[in-house]
Amino acid sequence: MRKIDLAIYDDFVSPSYLEAIQSACDPSSTPWYFQGSQSLTDYDDALIEDFGFSIGILPPWQPDQFDDTPIATLIKPLIYRIKDIAKADHILRCRLDMTVLHDRYLHPPHIDIGQPHVACIVYVNDSDGDTVIYDHKTKWAKEYCDTGNLPIRERIAPKAGRMVLFDGNYLHTGYSPSEHQTRILINTVLS
């Protein structure tokens, strides 16, 4: 796997392909599945606002095996392109994530999995609800330090078609949108 610190690619997804993805995951016509925790492995009553919705593309229990659904078939070429850019051997997980209008909620900081990996975000729609990558690398845990004093490595605004690749050991999080109904992204984990 290529050593990746942090890379941001604007207009990574071509306009017509992006439009097809947006149409395929439009919440007014596509079923989304409730997730009690967007950020953490286990649901926590104390973090009741850390909810969102998802659509599985490639589940973590079957690396490199995409679901046999129309939306997974549509997104698969994009994920293979990302895999090639990252020079990754495996796609460990891929899902669509949607957070909804909220009053400036910052989700809990986290890393996605315990093994060394590259994390990838592709924003599907223009929205607010920045992604925050802290200048702090850590190992996977159920809880993380208070980020109040951690320096921010990068703050990235959700822009349709923008792709962010980063070392998955960076502690990171995101905001729910407070000025748009939805913030939709494709979240992929590679090794």
Predicted regions and their residues:
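Catalytic core of non-heme Fe(II) oxygenases with the double-stranded beta-helix
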Residues: D68-S191
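Non-heme Fe(II)/2-oxoglutarate
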Residues: M1-K87
